[in-house]
Amino acid sequence: MLRITFLGTGGSLPTRNRNPSAVMINREGELMLFDCGEGTQQQMMRAKTGMMSLSSIFVSHFHADHFLGIPGLIQTMSFMGRKDPLMIYGPAGTREFTELFKALGYFNLKYEIHGMELKPGDVVEGEGYVVRALETEHSTPSLGYALIENPRPGRFNREKAVALGVPPGPLFSKLQKGNPVEAGGKVVRPEEVMGTPRPGRTIVYSGDTRPCEAVLEASRDADLLIHDGSFADEMAEWAEESMHSTAGEVAALAKEAGVRKLVLTHISSRYTDDVEPILKDSKKVFENVIVAEDLMELEIPYRPE
């Protein structure tokens, strides 16, 4: 399972229907939160994502609309009896902010919280995946992130295994797990009976940024790109000045990168009643695009074989 829940899709100002930035990724039951704007914990409750399985928070930058939800969330999890440690990753300043988060409210946490500062190119290793930090272009030190699953084993060739003398049963399982087995007086290796490794899935989260090279390169052939799409193209000058992106700019990046699906988020409050200008400008360039809405969910399937 790889499920994306958009908890907050608004721009710098929250609106009546958009919370500040927060995206939850549920990968095989492990929860990872990318940014955590004000009110994120309530959005988690509304979306029924759960929170106690949250392993890590990846902060793109320390503008208030991307991190103010963290203190309340960590307090709630403490009240609910959390014991597992929580990791907070982000750019320069993350350790200092983490200590501040722990001090707010004057309560004793029942679990450990660790802050780790990342630089572009740094990799956080998980079980079956990595998260790579990307250099982005915003008005303060900022990072994007690429979640990259490890390749999956190729398909098991039962007929070939039998032909090599391996009897059906436990030895099949060992081969599928990558272990050589002995059968008929000889060693049979996994590569003899397993097909070509199959690619895992890749999700890229830009955070707030201008269109930039690092996000483009990380997004090549990605399954999903979640990108700052704050403005319609008519606001191009202001987007450049404020270090955000327009829908058309992001669509062009997605097209060049060959992504499978594009989701625009961090939608400016000027589009509270109508996101059609953003959608129209992006679809001129790239068809498979969605303007995110709060509590929207996406399931990311494996690629067809």
Swiss-Prot record:
Zn(2+) 1 binds at residues 61, 63, 138, 208. SMART domains: Lactamase_B. Its EC number is 3.1.26.11. Pfam families: Lactamase_B_2. It comes from the Archaea. Keywords: Endonuclease, Hydrolase, Metal-binding, Nuclease, tRNA processing, Zinc. The active site is at residue 65. Binds 2 Zn(2+) ions. Its cofactor is Zn(2+). Zn(2+) 2 binds at residues 65-66, 208, 266. It catalyses: Endonucleolytic cleavage of RNA, removing extra 3' nucleotides from tRNA precursor, generating 3' termini of tRNAs. A 3'-hydroxy group is left at the tRNA terminus and a 5'-phosphoryl group is left at the trailer molecule. One of its GO terms (molecular function) is zinc ion binding. It is an enzyme of class 3 (hydrolase). Homodimer. Zinc phosphodiesterase, which displays some tRNA 3'-processing endonuclease activity. Probably involved in tRNA maturation, by removing a 3'-trailer from precursor tRNA. Belongs to the RNase Z family. This is Ribonuclease Z. It comes from Methanosarcina acetivorans (strain ATCC 35395 / DSM 2834 / JCM 12185 / C2A). The lineage of its organism: Archaea, Methanobacteriati, Methanobacteriota, Stenosarchaea group, Methanomicrobia.
